[in-house]
Swiss-Prot record:
Catalytic activities: O-phospho-L-seryl-[protein] + H2O = L-seryl-[protein] + phosphate; O-phospho-L-threonyl-[protein] + H2O = L-threonyl-[protein] + phosphate
Species per Swiss-Prot/TrEMBL record: Mycoplasma genitalium (strain ATCC 33530 / DSM 19775 / NCTC 10195 / G37)
EC nos: 3.1.3.16
Pfam families in UniProt: PP2C_2
GO molecular function, one term: protein serine/threonine phosphatase activity
Location of the PPM-type phosphatase domain: 9-254
GO biological process, one term: signal transduction
Keywords: Hydrolase, Protein phosphatase
The protein, known as: Putative protein phosphatase
Keyword Hydrolase: yes
Record Gene3D superfamilies: PPM-type phosphatase domain (3.60.40.10)
InterPro entries in the cross-refs: PP2C (IPR015655), PPM-type-like_dom_sf (IPR036457), PPM-type_phosphatase-like_dom (IPR001932)
Disulfide bonds: none
Domain of life: Bacteria
């Protein structure tokens, strides 16, 4: 994993005051002067959440660093992502079968993922689950991911208010994660844009965005003396607002990255 460069990217991941362990993961990796950033959130309700998030995150970092990209475009990065996602599933299955000898409490270990690939001109965002990516500029925070949860799935199906109400206690349940289910269809979210006037890219887990209003992201970051202080201030604000989860943020100064 590439060490953070506080001039244009950094990150932070902490357990928080409630959880017994930190099941989040974040990291950075380079390939041909292009940058990958990733945040994973292991499923807290299951055994092995920390194992899953670390295995998945580290695999994406290492395979990005070692892959020979012939070109940097949407088709190429999507193909790389899909192949790496397949490998992640098989590694989770292998981990379950060999390391944990198919112990039933580890059968549902899984992780979310949000991942950004940055060239000097483009941003490619992939996600699975409910970890998020925001683009920040002009005192605004634009959410560019869409949570894979029951609510969004029902809305996409044009569910009426009555049906939504009947699932009111389950609407935030995840409908897509990275798990050991190797035969499931590959489903992921994707977003691509040019680096223009955007100032920051923020990837984060729900322990942060559920407890800090996105309208405050830009102010907190730009009022901090550097990126390292910015991610700590985001963490501190989520604690002040009673976050009950692990808290992870990975932050890139896009203009400094573009010029580096």
């Amino acid at each position: 994993m590439q060490a953070a460069n506080d001039h244009f990217f950094t990150g932070l991941s902490k357990k928080g005051p409630v959880r017994k362990e930190n099941q989040d993961f974040y990291g950075f990796s380079f390939n041909q002067n292009n940058l990958l950033i990733v945040v994973c959130d292991g499923l807290g309700g299951y055994k092995g959440g920390k194992i899953a998030s670390n295995l998945v995150g580290k695999l994406f970092l290492s395979l990005f660093e070692g892959f020979e990209f012939n070109q940097w475009d949407e088709t190429t990065v999507k193909k790389w992502f899909e192949n790496t996602l397949i490998q992640a599933r098989f590694q989770l299955e292998n981990c379950f079968q060999t390391v944990y000898e198919a112990q039933i409490q580890f059968a549902r270990m899984a992780s979310t993922l949000v991942l950004g690939i940055l060239t000097k001109s483009d941003i490619y965002i992939f996600w699975i689950g409910d970890s998020r990516a925001y683009l920040l500029f002009e005192n605004q925070a634009k959410l560019v991911t869409k949570d894979h949860n029951l609510y969004n799935q029902l809305v996409a199906m044009n569910a009426d208010e009555k049906l939504l109400l009947s699932y009111s206690n389950q609407l935030l349940a995840l409908t897509n994660t990275i798990s050991k289910e190797t035969k499931r269809p590959l489903v992921y979210g994707f977003y691509n844009t040019k680096i223009e006037q955007q100032e920051f890219l923020l990837l984060c887990s729900d322990g942060l965005y559920n407890f800090v209003e996105k309208e405050l992201f830009f102010e907190i970051i730009t009022n901090s003396k550097n990126l390292k202080q910015a991610v700590f201030n985001l963490y501190r604000k989520s604690i002040e607002n009673a976050s009950n989860d692990n808290i992870t943020a990975a932050l890139v100064n896009l203009q400094k990255w573009k010029q580096s």
